[in-house]
């Protein structure tokens, strides 16, 4: 199962063959088609690896697209789009087109578009993998700052374990379409359940992840 298949399972664009997807105590694998469409439209939003921007639309028009599809009035959607634009640090770029932006700026537009619809859940499909390392770190830090402000549930999919440790408070490591281990970064690095997970953790600077209590040994009393 590739990453995009996992994303599609979360949103039921591909029907899971087994298991459950629980959102707000509801198993969405069992809800009606209309309820599912409402969930996707109003509670979920996605940020793609390759931005997915419309080249013929301005930055502000790209950001407001989801609101347009939802049927919101023009002024309302422009106000929300402008707020999202400012949040990602692109104030003043509203009338530019995607071709006039750098890769990092385009990804900011993609992020702003996802946030403009005010979703409860943001799904990130390897959003920064196409960026150079410096811009990638900037975007990671910016997203963490935005998360502190918005307090949204974020599902961040990546092949980079160091990125997962930086971005996630809980991590699920998958192999062949199945979850190998779920835990905090500290739990996974300190106690990998098998060789596959241990190999993931091999090059991790453990001092960045583990607390002193995890590595200290209790002194034996005589």
Identify the role of each PLM range:
Residues 26-27, 64, 68, 75-93, ...:
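Conserved ABC ATPase "signature" region
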Residues 116-120:
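A short, proline-enriched helix->beta-strand linker immediately N-terminal to the Walker B motif
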Residues 182-183, 191:
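ABC ATPase "signature
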Residues 28-45, 69, 75, 192:
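ABC ATPase NBD coupling module
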